[in-house]
């Protein structure tokens, strides 16, 4: 019983983030117009507490080594949480406008869901968990890009993001299938001993890196405004 409890507590970063996400979701559903003015500072305070919770050192591998928690991963998660808190602080004025005031809950929930996916990517000890975390981060991020769906620029950017994410996922999974086929493992710790530098493994690495590059949008794409200027 104690071992199970300690294993669950090793997920304190993810569990605390899920708790903040649920609080933001329920507050958006049930909070009245007068109480919404406390929405922004409350979420920022909860995120600040979550950053401090991430700094608690813990070293443990869960789910057969597929999830790994170390002091280094805790530091990286704290940096990601601090970046998210900075985004929330900078977005206060934008969310306070009349045309975006009603989108506060959606913005917080989608941003926190993206951060949750990044947490799983950081603690991944297996390519499967890494891919699941990548998709958990990409799908809410696509919704964030198209948050202002009635504006042409936002809708087009969301469509581009979804298409590029689909293409990158196909490349990444194709690369992972070659990695597993040539090495027989998807665990990060076991993979270096299985790599032989064959042409097929090099091709698999190229596919994986290409998929990651497309998912990170490491390429240029002209916006509608740029195309109008070029004309």
State what each model feature region is.
Residues 1-221:
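Alpha-helical transmembrane segments of multi-pass membrane proteins predominantly involved
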Residues 219-231:
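Single conserved hydrophobic/aromatic residue that forms the stacking wall/gate
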């Amino acid at each position: 019983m104690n071992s199970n409890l300690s294993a669950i507590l090793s997920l304190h970063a993810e569990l605390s983030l899920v708790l903040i996400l649920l609080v933001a979701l329920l507050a958006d559903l049930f909070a009245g117009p007068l109480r919404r003015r406390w929405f922004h500072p409350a979420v920022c305070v909860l995120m600040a507490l979550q950053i401090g919770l991430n700094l608690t050192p813990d070293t443990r591998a869960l789910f057969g080594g597929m999830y790994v928690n170390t002091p280094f991963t805790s530091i990286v998660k704290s940096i990601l949480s601090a970046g998210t808190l900075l985004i929330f602080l900078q977005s206060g004025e934008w969310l306070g406008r009349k045309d975006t005031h009603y989108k506060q809950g959606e913005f917080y929930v989608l941003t926190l869901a993206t951060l949750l996916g990044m947490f799983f990517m950081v603690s991944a000890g297996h390519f499967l968990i890494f891919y699941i975390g990548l998709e958990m981060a990409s799908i809410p991020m696509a919704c964030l890009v198209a948050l202002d769906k009635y504006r042409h620029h936002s809708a087009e950017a969301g469509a581009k993001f979804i298409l590029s994410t689909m293409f990158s996922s196909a490349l990444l999974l194709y690369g992972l299938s070659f990695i597993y086929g040539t090495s027989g493992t998807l665990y990060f710790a076991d993979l270096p001993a299985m790599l032989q530098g064959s042409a097929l493994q090099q091709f698999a690495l190229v596919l994986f890196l290409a998929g990651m590059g497309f998912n990170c949008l490491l390429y240029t794409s002209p916006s509608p405004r740029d195309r109008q200027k070029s004309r």
